[in-house]
A protein has these predicted regions:
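Hydrophobic residues embedded in beta-strands of well-ordered beta-sheets
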Residues: 57, 263-264
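Class I S-adenosyl-L-methionine
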Residues: 278-279, 422-499
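S-adenosylmethionine
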Residues: 340, 350-451
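Non-catalytic nucleic-acid substrate-recognition regions in nucleic-acid-modifying enzymes
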Residues: 2-247, 496-498
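Conserved S-adenosyl-L-methionine
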Residues: 288-375, 379, 388
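SAM-dependent Rossmann-like transferase core, predominantly class I methyltransferases
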Residues: 264-301
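Short, charged/polar, Gly/Pro-enriched secondary-structure boundary elements
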Residues: 64-72, 273-276, 465-467
C-alpha cells in the first residue's frame, strides 16, 4: 500500500521552489490501491518522475505540458499545488488557529498557479489584477453556521468549547427524534437570519475576477476547528487579497485546502468534473469508473492481435476503455441483462458519433454458457457482481464457480490470463481453490471503491486442457435436488460444447 500523504518531502518537488517558475507541481488523484499503475502511465507517456502517496501521485511538469496530463486515463482529478507545509503547528487556542489560517493565504505562489489555471480553462481576464495587503485580522467566526453540518460522530467535538457548539451538537447523548419542533424551527430560523446577514455583507464588498470557493478536507483528531471554519478563514483572506467574488455553487475557480494533522497544502482544481465520467452517456446502477477499467486492462498487459472478453460487461465500460487505448486488440463484451446491453450500445454509439474508431462489439449472453470456441480468447477482464446492489453473496458462490470454469474453457492454455474485480473475497478465494488446476493465482491488489474494500485478482491459465466431462469434486457433496445445495456439479446436465 502507498504511504500516507504526510510522508512526502516538499523539497523533492521542484514545482514548489521559487527558482523553477517554468515548472509546476501537479497532484493527480487515483483510486487507492492503483497509484503505482497511474505512476507507470505518467512515466511512460510524460517521462516525469512521480512521488506516490495514498490516493495521489505528484509530478513536476513544464507549464506548457499541462494539457497533456488530461490525456492520461488512469487518473480522476488534476490539481496544481501552490504551497506545501509539513509542520504547520496548530495552537490550542481556536482564535490563534484562525489567525494562522488567515495569514497562511499569503504564502502560496498564486501567480504561477493562476497562470496554469487560466491557460487550462482559457479564462479571458487576468485573474490577479491587484494584490491587497491583509488587515492582519481573521474573519468573524460563525460556528453556528460552519458547524451545523458536523455530525455527532466527529472526532473533534470534544476539542471545541461547549459554549460555541450548535444546538444539535450540544445534545450529544440525546436522540435526534427527541428534539421538539420548536427547537428545530429555532435552529433553522437563526441560521436563515444569519445567512441573510452574511450575504448582505458580501454584497457591500465590490468584487471582480473569477467566482471562487474554498473546499477544505481535514483529517486528524487534534484540531479544535471544523473544515468549514478553516475554509472560512482561508477564503476570507483570499477574498481580501484579490477581491474575487465568493460563489459556493456556480463557481469558476475551486481552491483546495488539505489539512492532515500538521501537514497542510494548497491547490487549485484543474478539472470541472472527475475524468472518469468523460466517456459515458448512459449510466447504470453499478457503472465502474472508467479509470479503474483502464487500470484493469493495463494490468492484463494486452499485446497487438489478442482478444479480450468481458463476460459480465454491464455498461461496457471495460471494453470501451480498452478499445480506446489498445486499438490493435479486439474487445468483446456481453451481459445476461438486456437493459445493460442496451446501455452498452448507447455508450458505444455516443463515442462513435464523436469520431472514435473502436474494435469493439457487445452481445447478450450467459456468462456460464458463452457462445465462443474453446481457447479463442487471450484475456478476460471483468467486474464481477459484488452481491450488494445486484445479486447476493449466496448467488456469487455459484456464479463465480461456473464463470471461472467457462472462462477457463475459452482462454488459451499456458498464456491466457484473467483480471477480475470483486468485493466478495470469500466467494472468490473459495472458488479459485476449487479450480486451481485450471487457474493459478498470480497476485492481487486491494483497492477502495466508494468506501468498499475490493480486490483485483490476476489469474494465469494453466496448461491443463479443459475437459467438458471434468468434475471438480467439492469437500461436501450434495445432490442438486437437495435444498440448500450451493455447489451443483458443473456440466452435469449440460451437453458437451463442440470445438
Amino acid at each position: 500500500m502507498a504511504p500516507g500523504i504526510t510522508s512526502i518531502d516538499p523539497s523533492s518537488l521542484k514545482g514548489l521552489l521559487a527558482e523553477h517558475q517554468d515548472i509546476c507541481t501537479l497532484e493527480l488523484t487515483a483510486v487507492t490501491g492503483l497509484e503505482e499503475v497511474a505512476a507507470e502511465e505518467c512515466q511512460e507517456k510524460l517521462g516525469v518522475n512521480c512521488v506516490i502517496a495514498r490516493g495521489r501521485v505528484f509530478i513536476d511538469i513544464h507549464v506548457q505540458q499541462v494539457p497533456e496530463v488530461f490525456k492520461l486515463r488512469s487518473i480522476d482529478n488534476v490539481n496544481v499545488i501552490l504551497q506545501m507545509v509539513t509542520n504547520f503547528s496548530f495552537p490550542d487556542n481556536r482564535e490563534q488557529c484562525f489567525q494562522q489560517l488567515y495569514k497562511f493565504a499569503e504564502k502560496p505562489d498564486w501567480r504561477k498557479g493562476m497562470s496554469v489555471w487560466k491557460n487550462v480553462f482559457s479564462f479571458s481576464e487576468e485573474p490577479i489584477q491587484e494584490v491587497k495587503a491583509l488587515n492582519n485580522d481573521y474573519c468573524k467566526p460563525r460556528p453556528d453556521i460552519d458547524l451545523k453540518r458536523m455530525k455527532l460522530t466527529s472526532q473533534i467535538i470534544d476539542n471545541i468549547p461547549e459554549g460555541i457548539l450548535p444546538q444539535h451538537l450540544k445534545k450529544k447523548w440525546q436522540p435526534e427524534e427527541e428534539q421538539t419542533n420548536a427547537e428545530i424551527n429555532s435552529i433553522v430560523t437563526d441560521t436563515t437570519v444569519e445567512s441573510e446577514e452574511d450575504s448582505s455583507e458580501k454584497q457591500r464588498v465590490q468584487a471582480s475576477g473569477p467566482k471562487f470557493r474554498i473546499s477544505c478536507n481535514r483529517t486528524g483528531t487534534n484540531h479544535n476547528f471544523g473544515s468549514s471554519e478553516a475554509a472560512r478563514q482561508f477564503g476570507g483572506a483570499v477574498n481580501e487579497m484579490f477581491g474575487w467574488p465568493v460563489d459556493l455553487s456556480c463557481f469558476e475557480l475551486e481552491i483546495l485546502l488539505y489539512i492532515d494533522t500538521e501537514f497542510v497544502y494548497v491547490g487549485v482544481c484543474l478539472t470541472r468534473e472527475p475524468l472518469f465520467k468523460r466517456n459515458l452517456t448512459n449510466f447504470g446502477r453499478t457503472n465502474l469508473r472508467s479509470t479503474i477499467c483502464y487500470n484493469m486492462v493495463r494490468l492484463a498487459a494486452p499485446q497487438p492481435g489478442e482478444v479480450i472478453v468481458d463476460p459480465l460487461c454491464g455498461g461496457a465500460t471495460i471494453p470501451m476503455e480498452g478499445s480506446l487505448t489498445y486499438s490493435k486488440v479486439l474487445h468483446l463484451g456481453g451481459d445476461n441483462f438486456g437493459q445493460a446491453v442496451k446501455r452498452s450500445r448507447d455508450n458505444i454509439d455516443y463515442l462513435v458519433k464523436k469520431g472514435k474508431s473502436m474494435p469493439i462489439d457487445v452481445a447478450q449472453w450467459d456468462a456460464a454458457r458463452l457462445p465462443l470456441r474453446n481457447q479463442c480468447v487471450d484475456i478476460i477482464v471483468s467486474d464481477l457482481p459484488f452481491g450488494k446492489r445486484i445479486g447476493s453473496k449466496g448467488d456469487n458462490r455459484v456464479l463465480y464457480y461456473n464463470s471461472l470454469l467457462e472462462m477457463a474453457r475459452i482462454t488459451r492454455t499456458g498464456t491466457g490470463r484473467a483480471v477480475l474485480l470483486t468485493h466478495d473475497r470469500n466467494s472468490m478465494m473459495r472458488n479459485i481453490k476449487r479450480v486451481h488446476t485450471l487457474w493459478k493465482s498470480a497476485t492481487s491488489r486491494t483497492i477502495n471503491i466508494g468506501g468498499l474494500s475490493a480486490v483485483i485478482y490476476i489469474l494465469h491459465r494453466t496448461a491443463l486442457l479443459f475437459d467438458p466431462n471434468l468434475k471438480i469434486a467439492s469437500k461436501t457433496h450434495k445432490k442438486p435436488s437437495e435444498p440448500g445445495t450451493m455447489w451443483p456439479e458443473y456440466l452435469a446436465a449440460r451437453p458437451p460444447l463442440s470445438t
